[in-house]
Amino acid sequence: MSRGSGGGYDRHITIFSPEGRLFQVEYAFKAVKAAGITSIGVRGKDSVCVVTQKKVPDKLLDQTSVSHLFPITKYLGLLATGMTADARTLVQQARNEAAEFRFKYGYEMPVDVLSKWIADKSQVYTQHAYMRPLGVVAMILGIDEEKGPQLFKCDPAGHFFGHKATSAGSKEQEAINFLEKKMKNDPAFSYEETVQTAISALQSVLQEDFKASEIEVGVVKKEDPIFRVLTTEEIDEHLTAISERD
C-alpha cells in the first residue's frame, strides 16, 4: 500500500488499518529481510547450533568487530538477524535482565524465560506511538536443566516459539522448506550432525560454498553448556566434512 492510498495507517504504529493490519509492524519484518542476511538454527539431541552469514560491507573494516552472535550470559547465546544497531540495544537490556534474574533467584535465567522477556519487550514496542518496533529477529539458544537443548525465535511483533529448527532473514522460506525435509523423521542429531545440518542448509538455500570466514557459528552442548562461537579453524573442519560427505 502506497503512502497516498494508505490513509495514514502505515504512518502510525498504534492504528489498525480497516483490514486489521499494523503496517509499521509488517515493515519491521521487511527490514529484517532487507538486511540481506540469512540465519539458521538447528536443535540436536544434546546440542543447539545457529549459523549466519558474515558480510563485511567495507574492506577497511576489522572483520573481528563484525558479528551477529552475542552472549547474553555464559550459558545463553543470541543470534540477531536484521538491523544490528537495534540488536545491540536489545542485547544490552537482555544482559541486564539476565544478570538481575541471577542475582534475585540464585540460578541462571532459563532460555524460555529470556525469550518471553524479549518477546514482551518487542510487543510493547508495537503499542506505543512514541516507539517503533525493533527490526530484529532473535534466535536464543541454551541448555535447560530439565528440558535439555532449547532453541527459541522472537520476532518484531512479539511472537516467541520453541523450534526444532528455524530460519530468519532474506531466504527464510527456502531454508524452512529445506529444514522441514531434513527434520521430517524427528532425527536425534549428534553435535557434529547438528552443526553440519545447519551449515549445509545455509549452503543449500544460498547455493554457494562458503569460506570459514564468511559465516558465523554459535553452539551450546549438553555436556558443556557454555555458549561458544566457533573459530574459523573449527568451521573449516565442518566445511571439509560436509564436502567429503557430499
Swiss-Prot record:
It is found in: Cytoplasm; Nucleus. CDD domains: proteasome_alpha_type_6. One of its GO terms (biological process) is proteasome-mediated ubiquitin-dependent protein catabolic process. GO terms for cellular component: cytoplasm; nucleus; proteasome core complex, alpha-subunit complex. Its main location: cytoplasm. Keywords: Cytoplasm, Nucleus, Proteasome. InterPro entries: Ntn_hydrolases_N (IPR029055), Proteasome_alpha (IPR050115), Proteasome_alpha-type (IPR023332), Proteasome_asu_N (IPR000426), Proteasome_sua/b (IPR001353), Proteasome_subunit_alpha6 (IPR034642). The keyword Ribonucleoprotein does not apply. The keyword Cytoplasm applies. The proteasome is a multicatalytic proteinase complex which is characterized by its ability to cleave peptides with Arg, Phe, Tyr, Leu, and Glu adjacent to the leaving group at neutral or slightly basic pH. The proteasome has an ATP-dependent proteolytic activity. Belongs to the peptidase T1A family. The 26S proteasome consists of a 20S proteasome core and two 19S regulatory subunits. The 20S proteasome core is composed of 28 subunits that are arranged in four stacked rings, resulting in a barrel-shaped structure. The two end rings are each formed by seven alpha subunits, and the two central rings are each formed by seven beta subunits. The catalytic chamber with the active sites is on the inside of the barrel. This is Proteasome subunit alpha type-6.
